[in-house]
Amino acid sequence: EDNHSTVEDDAANYDFDLFVIGAGSGGVRAARFSANLGAKVGICELPFHPISSEVIGGVGGTCVIRGCVPKKILVYGASFGGELEDAKNYGWELNEKIDFNWKKLLQKKTDEIIRLNNIYKRLLSNAGVKLYEGEGKIVGPNEVQVTQLDGTKLSYSAKHILIATGSRAQRPNIPGQELAITSDEALSLEEFPKRVVILGGGYISVEFASIWRGMGADVNLCFRKELPLRGFDDEMRAAVARNLEGRGVNVHPRTTLTELVKTDGGVVARTDHGEEIEADVVLFATGRSPNTKRLNLEALGVELDRTGAVKVDEYSRTSVPSIWAIGDVTNRMNLTPVALMEGTCFAKTVFGGQNSKPDYSNIACAVFSIPPLAVVGLSEEQAIEQASGDILVFTSSFNPMKNTISGRQEKTIMKLVVDAETDKVLGASMCGPDAAEIMQGIAIALKFGATKAQFDSTVGIHPSAAEEFVTMREPSRRVPGAGKPKTNL
């Protein structure tokens, strides 16, 4: 089926070839690339604010304003805590009392997200994209209405409409839920929280546990499962939990919060085990939901799934042929570089004359806990589930060289999952310092189908932790795949 648009054919009938709702990672990429391919593009975004709502957001979106970027800045900030400890055995005599100034770091973080917000606006204008500030709503298959801050409604027609409105943190429905904050507020707290309770087992909860603990807070992390980070490799999940505990986080598995109560001293969080934990701040990191409620999609027949995410085909097209969607709002793989890939593929498909499907295989990702976890490809559990033959698992667990002097007791763990028959490396994971920096290179190898023999033929960089990935000679175990025919021999 032909998705292409020739920009001339009936452009005269529309104000724009493309109108994008949402100027975050995906929306900005799609708008710029479409404009570079000759399309006339309009885009709308809510007014800027570090904490989002249905009517405020900002150019740059979650990643830049209240996501990856400010989060990573805080992770860097928190990491110095452990580094200063480790420095002592390396001869650094830090005699005066060391204080941490949260307000200073927060101000620097805010300056940086404002700088990036301006850079994103400049990227749009340099590409010739027309930016409108206000809330977008789709009123017809080819018509968008933008409501400005003062209530003025503007209407524009477009041959194609792209939904790129992203997602927002959601709150569990428990008594006292209004006393809790989400990741939005956590990145912009006025005062440093000395006592924190975090509810959630995903990457956001684990990262904030590391951030606040690294800065000296008393942290209680509660999650429903036995281990945090469902969906990641079980061995890595256990390593992350162990490291959190080793660095002083109070970990509460198989625990959820039943009620929050305001007290003079702060907030008391009650758990389903009957515990009461007093905190200055309670953070809910219990998932995100797509921003689709106010777009008028049902009225237009744009199909949504049960979570409210926009359903799309493999080219990011919705059930209405002139309307497309990319990024978190489609709930495919909610990562910034994935939204960028989807935006690029959309522009090529619709305005570049080449049908391009996003490829979701072997996308590396990281959890910026301290120390971090990074993975690419299949976890051991996924590989076993999908395999029809045997799986070879290679693991290495070691005390990094840096720790031998600092005295820190924290093992790095690495793993390769290999198809025994073809020798192809199906997955790699690592929990330890610099995991994300190391995994990006491994991801290239996996993307191109590297075998274990090719890993083995690579000479390592010595001394480094990364070299362990090319020196794992003997498998730790051989596991039959779930689809392997059972014999009774």
Swiss-Prot record:
Subunit-structure text: Homodimer.
Name of the molecule in the record: Glutathione reductase, chloroplastic
Localization annotation: Plastid, Chloroplast
Biological role stated in the UniProt entry: Catalyzes the reduction of glutathione disulfide (GSSG) to reduced glutathione (GSH). Maintains high levels of GSH in the chloroplast.
Gene Ontology terms: biological process: cell redox homeostasis; cellular response to oxidative stress; glutathione metabolic process
Segments crossing the lipid bilayer: none
Principal location: plastid
Active-site residues, record numbering mapped to chain: 462
Disulfide bonds: 63-68
Gene Ontology CC annotations of this record: chloroplast; cytoplasm; cytosol; mitochondrion
Binding, glutathione: 25, 120
Leftover remarks: The active site is a redox-active disulfide bond.
PANTHER family per record: GLUTATHIONE REDUCTASE
A Pfam family matched in the record: Pyr_redox_dim
Any GO molecular function: glutathione-disulfide reductase (NADPH) activity
Reactions catalysed: 2 glutathione + NADP(+) = glutathione disulfide + NADPH + H(+)
Cofactor note: Binds 1 FAD per subunit.
Family: Belongs to the class-I pyridine nucleotide-disulfide oxidoreductase family.
